[in-house]
Amino acid sequence: MKPGPPRRGTAQGQRVDTATHAPGARGLLLPPLLLLLLAGRAAGAQRWRNENFERPVDLEGSGDDDSFPDDELDDLYSGSGSGYFEQESGLETAMRFIPDMALAAPTAPAMLPTTVIQPVDTPFEELLSEHPSPEPVTSPPLVTEVTEVVEESSQKATTISTTTSTTAATTTGAPTMATAPATAATTAPSTPEAPPATATVADVRTTGIQGMLPLPLTTAATAKITTPAAPSPPTTVATLDTEAPTPRLVNTATSRPRALPRPVTTQEPDVAERSTLPLGTTAPGPTEMAQTPTPESLLTTIQDEPEVPVSGGPSGDFELQEETTQPDTANEVVAVEGAAAKPSPPLGTLPKGARPGPGLHDNAIDSGSSAAQLPQKSILERKEVLVAVIVGGVVGALFAAFLVTLLIYRMKKKDEGSYTLEEPKQASVTYQKPDKQEEFYA
């Protein structure tokens, strides 16, 4: 037996197999290498593009060396190159309003669930539903952040709670003020278990306490929670319509009061700064407030007259001066010191001893001979326009006649000149040939 040739054959077969499998392995390695090369090129191009976008080269002026559009540049700086500006990143602003960990008080009474505060009309239910459920955290820096958040939310809640309490009082007729949690409608709830840093949140001043009382005839007054005995000038005025039974509350805090007698202000009841209810207990039944109007109350109406701003300086024609002699009392009931309400006079009539105030029609410009004050006349009825039309027509007719006569004269002169030019030609032609021939032959 000769085993040599079979072994050589097997070796050659193995060599052929490796030779055939080597290109396949290379083909499998080429696509990952190409992908890595393309990824490196793309990363380099992206880095170069980001560097050019973030740090452009200042070629012409000092106002073009940033990557912001023109609308945002107006808010940041003027572009004169005299100063620097700091741009806050979006991550910092997002971290302010959406913190990673929930803000909570070190004790549970600082932020109660919505079911415990349900009997009191407070706007904190929506605020608590937006944030996740708080967990008790005992770190001291979080205590100060909680107090600031509660103060801001309580100040924002003063304007919303007064409107909800007035609508509930007018529809159901039940009083909305409670004795113990009286400060819950306008300030943040504070409990005795809370630390003193959070207990001072209740000392928030409000000026819209008028909306909590559902009185049909309330006096124009405001009261502060911390100092209820000190009267203040009226900022909220109740205007009563003669036909509608429900009163309308009109806020005229920005208007200036007229020269009227000072109304008697009603003092709000003393409100406890800190509630004494333990945790887990509901508020007691509300106590009814006295709703009888005092006989010395004064229901005043404040009238605002329009003021026309003039940019050209003070001129007597376009200024509307305010006078306090005659307020417009149409559709308004004014009760002075308990007297019976008098019917309002009809429009256009004035009481005795009162002179009419300045109106919009009294400020008209004095009528004169100017063309701006006579828009109702036609153009041809004015003397200036009529004279101008007549003179223009005469001048135009004369100019047209002059042109016509000039053309006629030129035509006649041209005709006469043609006849004079043709006559010597005929004479010369008839004269030259026979004379020369006769003279030559002669």
From Swiss-Prot:
Which key words tag this protein in UniProt? Cell membrane, Glycoprotein, Heparan sulfate, Membrane, Phosphoprotein, Proteoglycan, Signal, Transmembrane, Transmembrane helix
Primary subcellular site in the record, as a coarse category = membrane
**Spans within the Extracellular topological domain:** 45-387
PTM Phosphotyrosine: at which residues?
Answer: 409, 419, 431, 441
Q: Which residues lie on this side of the membrane: Cytoplasmic?
A: 409-442
Q: Which residues are glycosylated?
A: 78, 80, 82, 89, 107, 161-163, 170, 172, 315, 367
What does the entry report about post-translational modification of this chain?
O-glycosylated within the Thr/Ser-rich region which could interact with lectin domains on other molecules.
Might you report a single GO cellular component term? membrane
Per the record's keyword annotation, is Zinc included, yes or no?
no
Record-annotated membrane-spanning stretches: 388-408
Task: Note whether Signal occurs among the keywords.
Answer: yes
Tell me which positions the record assigns to the signal sequence. Answer: 1-44
- Where does this protein reside within or beyond the cell? Cell membrane
User: Site annotation (Cleavage of ectodomain): which residues?
Assistant: 383-384
**Which molecular-function annotations from GO does this UniProt entry contain?**
identical protein binding
Q: Where is this region: Disordered?
A: 1-25, 47-80, 152-199, 253-293, 305-327, 419-442
- Compositional bias per record (Basic and acidic residues), positions renumbered to this chain: 48-58, 433-442
- What InterPro entries does the record point to? Neurexin-like (IPR003585), Syndecan (IPR001050), Syndecan/Neurexin_dom (IPR027789), Syndecan_CS (IPR030479)
| Comp. bias regions, Low complexity | 157-199, 276-287
Biased-composition ranges, Acidic residues, are 61-75
- Membrane topology of the entry: Single-pass type I membrane protein
User: How does the record describe its quaternary structure?
Assistant: Interacts with TIAM1. Interacts with PTN (via heparan sulfate chains); this interaction mediates the neurite outgrowth-promoting signal from PTN to the cytoskeleton of growing neurites; this interaction mediates osteoblast recruitment. Interacts with MDK; this interaction induces SDC3 clustering; this interaction induces neuronal cell adhesion and neurite outgrowth.
Q: What does this protein do?
A: Cell surface proteoglycan that may bear heparan sulfate. May have a role in the organization of cell shape by affecting the actin cytoskeleton, possibly by transferring signals from the cell surface in a sugar-dependent mechanism.
Task: Please report which protein family the annotation says this sequence is part of.
Answer: Belongs to the syndecan proteoglycan family.
Q: What is this protein called?
A: Syndecan-3
Origin species: Mus musculus
Gene behind this protein: Sdc3
